[in-house]
Amino acid sequence: MQMRSNDEVDRSIVQVPEIVQVPKGMLAFAKQFQEVMMMYTCAIREVKTKFEVLNDELSVRNKRNPIEMIKSRVKKPMSIVEKLSKRGQPITLESMISNLDDVAGVRVICSFLDDIYEVSDMIAKQDDIKIISIKDYIKNPKENGYRSYHMIIEVPVFFSDRKQPMKVEVQIRTIAMDFWASLEHQLRYKAAGEIPQFIAQELKECAANITNSDMKMQKIHSFLEDMDRFALK
């Protein structure tokens, strides 16, 4: 599909009959919003690259990849509006940038529990990364059983005329934690956010079982690593 320049888009809007013309102020806002979303997308790219580099390094050093998968997303406009409204904040770009830390999100899926803390520590130690906040929902799970390691970080993004610090939410979790969170989200969405108490309890028990499995897998992995170290001596 052939892409059109911004000038062509502007001209096409001007040529539309007056009754359906887009107000100039709205057009300017749309362009500003597009630019800000581009900046968040670039911030995601920077953070993903950092984790990919760490994964490559650790795959050589430890002979395995601690990161199974890296996912990312930029928050949808409607989600941004809903979150700002819920917090009683004005619906503006300035408000979004100031009040929302999770417009840009990166999710890192690790193999084992120890991998989560290893890669998060390595990211935190990088001198161009600023840690805004950390929430450890692994050691302190949410009431519904949700477990994950959350970081809000600020990363510099270099553009043609400036260096812009951008906030990115990073979620680090195991495969099992991601499996539970994904299914819980689907079920909650299907129930329109209202899950019966007995279902909520079942989900919480599933989360506890998954946690036990994660801990057992970590013990097995650590035991096998110890065996390898002793074999090399």
Predicted regions and their residues:
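Surface-exposed, low-hydrophobicity interaction/linker segments
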Residues: 43-48, 52-89
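Long beta-strand-rich cores associated with HINT superfamily self-processing modules
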Residues: 97, 110-219
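Short, flexible, solvent-exposed loop/turn segments with mixed acidic/basic and small polar residues
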Residues: 91-101
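General structural signal for secondary-structure boundaries
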Residues: 76, 92-93, 196
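Generic alpha-helical secondary structure
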Residues: 36, 40, 44, 77, ...
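An acidic, glycine-/histidine-flanked metal-binding catalytic module
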Residues: 2-44, 51-57, 168-233
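Short amphipathic alpha-helical segments
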Residues: 102-106
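Glycine-rich, low-complexity intrinsically disordered segments
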Residues: 67-70, 96, 109
